[in-house]
Design a protein with these regions (language model features):
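Boundary/entry segment of secreted carbohydrate-active catalytic domains
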Residues: 1-28
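C-terminal domain-boundary segment and adjacent tail
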Residues: 2-10, 40, 115, 147-156, ...
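A short acidic, amphipathic alpha-helical/loop segment
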Residues: 7, 31-35, 135-139, 215, ...
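Generic beta-sheet signal
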Residues: 16-18, 193-200
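Hydrophobic "anchor" residues on beta-strands that sit immediately upstream
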Residues: 19-20, 84, 229
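Active-site metal-binding loops of divalent metal-dependent hydrolases
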Residues: 22-25, 89, 204, 234
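Metal-dependent polysaccharide deacetylase catalytic core of the NodB/CE4 family, i.e.
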Residues: 37-146, 153-170, 196-204
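Catalytic-core region of carbohydrate-active enzymes that cleave or remodel glycosidic bonds
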Residues: 117-118, 138-152, 178-193, 217-223
Length: 285
């Protein structure tokens, strides 16, 4: 039997990936997405679709941050390339305080409205307030949600152990962000280690409230344009990882078959392999 472990690699054989996640569909997302797009970064924006404001509504001038969007502006913004739209529950409640039927309504109504708005399939989510319990997770699973982000910082680059408890690396104001960024840019996992995922989250209105747009601007400057980093949305991370897990290996791990529609990369020993959709290849070490 084989003794060497097999480790996933991201598209192109890369060992590092970066994803961002921002909540609440606020006007400050326009500036954030402009920064992301200019630097080639990708991310996921989590929307409570009940909270859109009516077309033509004007906020009072003293409202400086946290302004909600109209549906029309949200459709324009979150349809841009490199941006995923995901659920944040329909009315942004504390889901763990609700009955099973109320939780299901929040998820189904949010998913139904976003899928109608954007004309696609929406299966990702971030928990409103970051709170949940086992019953919330069960209902999410039954409603077809495949991942949901929490607010619990890991301060690590580990992939999630449970997709419906997807803990991020850190919030953008975490004091560890600079050292984590430096480590992620300058170092990399060894060939016999799991790949790294750097996951940063927040709310774009915080950049105005806290007067710290420089945090995300500096972060984008430092981490963008690296040919050894895969820049991806949350769903792209989930889909690729799940496709890797669908690879079929012979008992002695001398052959591998890829039943998915995506080319998958992995290492074994000191070798990097890629297996195309529908292909079976030998593993020589």
């Amino acid at each position: 039997m084989a003794t060497q472990s097999i480790y996933m690699r991201f598209p192109g054989g890369l060992s590092k990936a970066l994803t961002l996640s921002y909540d609440d569909a606020v006007e400050q997302d326009f500036r954030l997405i402009d920064i992301m797009t200019a630097h080639g970064l990708k991310g996921t924006f989590n929307i409570s679709s009940y909270q859109y404001i009516p077309e033509g509504y004007v906020y009072p001038p003293e409202k400086k941050w946290g302004q909600r969007m109209t549906m029309e502006r949200a459709t324009e913004l979150y349809s841009r390339d490199g941006i995923e739209h995901a659920l944040h529950a329909y009315t942004h409640p504390h889901l763990e305080t609700m009955s099973s039927s109320q939780i299901a309504y929040e998820i189904i109504k949010n998913r139904e409205s976003l899928e109608a708005q954007f004309g696609d399939i929406v299966r990702g989510m971030a928990y409103p307030y970051g709170t949940y319990n086992d019953e919330v997770i069960r209902v999410l699973h039954d409603c077809g949600i495949v991942y949901s982000r929490t607010v619990k910082a890991t301060l690590s680059f580990d992939l999630p152990g449970e997709w419906l408890k997807w803990h991020p690396t850190c919030h953008h104001t975490d004091p560890h962000l600079p050292e984590l960024t430096a480590k992620f840019v300058e170092k990399f996992p060894k060939v016999d280690q799991h790949p790294w995922l750097f996951y940063v989250w927040g709310h774009a209105y915080e950049f105005v409230r806290d007067d710290n747009w420089h945090i995300i601007e500096n972060f984008a400057d430092q981490i963008s344009g690296k040919d050894d980093i895969w820049y991806a949305t949350n769903m792209e991370i989930w889909e690729y990882t799940e496709n890797f897990r669908r690879l079929v290996f012979s008992l002695d791990e001398s052959r591998v078959y890829n039943p998915t529609a995506q080319t998958i990369y992995f290492t074994k020993g000191n070798m990097l392999y890629s297996v195309a959709p529908g292909q079976t290849i030998p593993i020589t070490n």
